[in-house]
């Protein structure tokens, strides 16, 4: 895997070991596949099995060799067409069986959603290291984490560690957006060691080959770059084929113009040559290439709004209409398709985006960057965007592209990646709860029960981030006895509402108060006792001071 230019940057170690309070388990399938899960063992003898994206990196029995890469999964078929074509033919593939167990749904539901184009399974034949997953509104909301170097900073080793770190905390997919040196080598290291699907934006590498000159781009150069990446195993590719020459002037009066890197590159090419982009004119040829590998289209929103002021404008929706036309063409070639969405959108305009995407794009899975619900919080855009992400996911978006605290400010580091993933896991899980996903509330119920019963270790271990939950608790109550105390430092021992409620329940149990009738009877007896006491004192309201 190493080349002379990349050996010095090659990763030697990454984060491994189980997440606190958990162990890696597998559900064995008849076809030889093993579906991963994370089991949280509770102190009351119970356990909860969770959807797991961390790959073998949290398996204590796994041997990790970054130079060899991960072992390929069994049962990969490369000669029967794409997952879409096979689903339309009525076939439940090995990947669909795997996903059905992972999601806790019937395999036929997986097949029908893929056949209808409402879900995609990004699984390039050349990426056998990945564990099959699905993106579609009938399933759990997924999150994508962007990593990748820039011309200014980062190394191959750092990007591989970011990938492992992101999936440890719940990233379902990774996009390698490298724009600096060693793009091919960085992607190779990530792919060979990634148990989740990997996406790219091929135009970035193509532009690097022209030394950064958009006007020098050609269809042949781009086509060769796509084939190069598909051969490596890239599972889905962002293609900004909807940026048409006539749409570029629509952005002239925007506050922030064109903010998509890919969109701006293609807009510059269109203006330089004064014709439609080669991505649009050669789209059918591109479909044929992607179909050979079963690479999924992620049709890019090159004209997405980059500010609240530009949300839902003419340029954005004009491009979306074109993406709808391209979706039909891609499906006719048997290529799986998802649609990328904004961006920066105020809360009251968010749902309109989902409705219009589903109408124009035949309900292809929607994949959105946030959206940010306000522009005023640099350094906190993982929060501003998670607000919009939760709303748009509840409305039907299938996958959320995370935003880190460094958005608009710089290249995210390891801590930023974790903060972004956790913020988006909150948004995705909140949407799953609202949509009634069959497994979503089990975790909430388990944690709430642990909280009420003061099982602190279980509270930590059931949380999205056990390490930080424990750290925050121990800042003020670090002693080991505090892990069984019936209070925390917020309320102290006298004012804890849950302890008081527990005392009330104990009192009720001791006095046989199980129903409302029992309570009413107790109150009546109490009133009778007080009435008798009042009579004993002469029925006087005021008594002399003793």
From Swiss-Prot:
Record: residues binding Zn(2+): 344, 408
Keyword Oxidoreductase annotated: no
Transmembrane regions: none
Record note on cofactor: Binds 1 [4Fe-4S] cluster per subunit. The cluster is coordinated with 3 cysteines and an exchangeable S-adenosyl-L-methionine.
GO molecular function: 4 iron, 4 sulfur cluster binding; carbon-carbon lyase activity; zinc ion binding
Protein residues bound to substrate: 146, 175, 204, 240, 260-262, 301-304, 340, 367
GO biological process: thiamine biosynthetic process; thiamine diphosphate biosynthetic process
Pathway: Cofactor biosynthesis; thiamine diphosphate biosynthesis
Co-factor(s): [4Fe-4S] cluster
Chain sites annotated for binding [4Fe-4S] cluster: 488, 491, 496
Region: Disordered, residue numbers: 1-20
Catalytic activities: 5-amino-1-(5-phospho-beta-D-ribosyl)imidazole + S-adenosyl-L-methionine = 4-amino-2-methyl-5-(phosphooxymethyl)pyrimidine + CO + 5'-deoxyadenosine + formate + L-methionine + 3 H(+)
Alphabetized InterPro entries for the sequence: ThiC, ThiC-associated_dom, ThiC/Bza_core_dom, ThiC/BzaA/B
Gene Ontology cellular component terms for the protein in this record: cytosol
Domain of life: Bacteria
Zinc-finger among keywords: no
Keywords annotated in UniProt: 4Fe-4S, Iron, Iron-sulfur, Lyase, Metal-binding, S-adenosyl-L-methionine, Thiamine biosynthesis, Zinc
Skewed-composition ranges (Polar residues): 1-19
Function: Catalyzes the synthesis of the hydroxymethylpyrimidine phosphate (HMP-P) moiety of thiamine from aminoimidazole ribotide (AIR) in a radical S-adenosyl-L-methionine (SAM)-dependent reaction.
Cited HAMAP family: ThiC (MF_00089)
Family per record: Belongs to the ThiC family.
Family annotation (NCBIfam families): PRK09284.1, PRK13352.1, thiC
Name the UniProt record assigns to this protein: Phosphomethylpyrimidine synthase
Source species: Mycobacteroides abscessus (strain ATCC 19977 / DSM 44196 / CCUG 20993 / CIP 104536 / JCM 13569 / NCTC 13031 / TMC 1543 / L948) (Mycobacterium abscessus)
């Amino acid at each position: 895997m190493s080349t002379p230019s990349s050996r010095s940057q090659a990763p030697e170690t990454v984060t491994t070991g189980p997440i606190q309070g958990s162990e890696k388990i597998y559900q064995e399938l008849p076809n030889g596949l093993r579906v991963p899960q994370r089991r949280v063992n509770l102190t009351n003898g119970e356990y909860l099995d969770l959807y797991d994206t961390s790959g073998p990196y949290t398996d204590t029995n796994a041997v990790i060799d970054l130079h060899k890469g991960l072992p390929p999964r069994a049962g990969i078929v490369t000669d029967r067409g794409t997952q879409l074509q096979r689903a339309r033919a009525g076939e439940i593939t090995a990947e669909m069986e795997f996903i059905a167990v992972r999601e806790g749904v019937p395999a036929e539901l997986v097949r029908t959603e893929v056949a209808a184009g409402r879900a995609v399974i990004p699984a390039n034949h050349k990426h056998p290291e990945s564990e099959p997953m699905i993106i579609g509104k009938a399933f759990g909301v997924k999150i994508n984490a962007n990593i990748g170097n820039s011309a200014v900073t980062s190394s191959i080793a750092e990007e591989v560690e970011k990938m492992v770190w992101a999936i440890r905390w719940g990233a379902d997919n990774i996009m390698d957006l490298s724009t600096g040196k060693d793009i091919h080598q960085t992607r190779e290291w990530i792919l060979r060691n990634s148990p989740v699907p990997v996406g790219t934006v091929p135009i970035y590498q193509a532009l690097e080959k022209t030394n950064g000159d958009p006007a020098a781009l050609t269809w042949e150069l781009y086509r060769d770059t796509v084939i190069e990446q598909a051969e490596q195993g890239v599972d889905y590719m962002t293609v900004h084929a909807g940026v048409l020459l006539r749409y570029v002037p629509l952005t002239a009066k925007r506050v922030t113009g064109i903010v998509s890197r890919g969109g701006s590159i293609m807009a510059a090419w269109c203006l330089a040559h004064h014709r439609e982009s080669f991505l649009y004119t050669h789209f059918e040829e591109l479909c044929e290439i992607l179909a050979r590998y079963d690479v999924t289209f992620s049709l890019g929103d090159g004209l997405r709004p980059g500010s609240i002021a530009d949300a839902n404008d003419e340029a954005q929706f004009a491009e979306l209409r074109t993406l709808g036309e391209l979706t039909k063409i891609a499906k006719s070639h048997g290529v799986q398709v998802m649609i990328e969405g904004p961006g920066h959108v105020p809360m009251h305009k968010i749902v309109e985006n989902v409705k219009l995407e589903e109408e124009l794009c035949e309900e292809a899975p929607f994949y959105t960057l946030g959206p940010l619900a306000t522009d005023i919080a640099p350094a906190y855009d993982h929060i501003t965007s998670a607000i919009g992400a939760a709303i748009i996911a509840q409305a039907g978006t299938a996958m959320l592209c995370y935003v880190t605290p460094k958005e608009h400010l710089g290249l995210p580091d390891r801590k930023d990646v974790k903060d972004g993933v956790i913020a988006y896991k909150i948004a995705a899980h909140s949407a799953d709860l609202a949509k009634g996903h069959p497994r979503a509330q089990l975790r909430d119920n388990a944690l709430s029960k642990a909280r009420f019963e003061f099982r602190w270790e279980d509270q930590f271990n059931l949380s999205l981030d056990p390490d930080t939950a424990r750290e925050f608790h121990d800042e003020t109550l670090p002693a080991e006895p505090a892990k069984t105390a019936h209070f925390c430092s917020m309320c102290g021992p006298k004012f804890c509402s849950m302890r008081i409620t527990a005392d009330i329940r104990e009192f009720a149990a001791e006095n046989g108060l199980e129903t409302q009738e029992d309570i009413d009877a107790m109150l009546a007896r109490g009133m009778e006792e007080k009435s008798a006491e009042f009579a004993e004192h002469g029925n006087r309201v005021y008594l002399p001071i003793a």
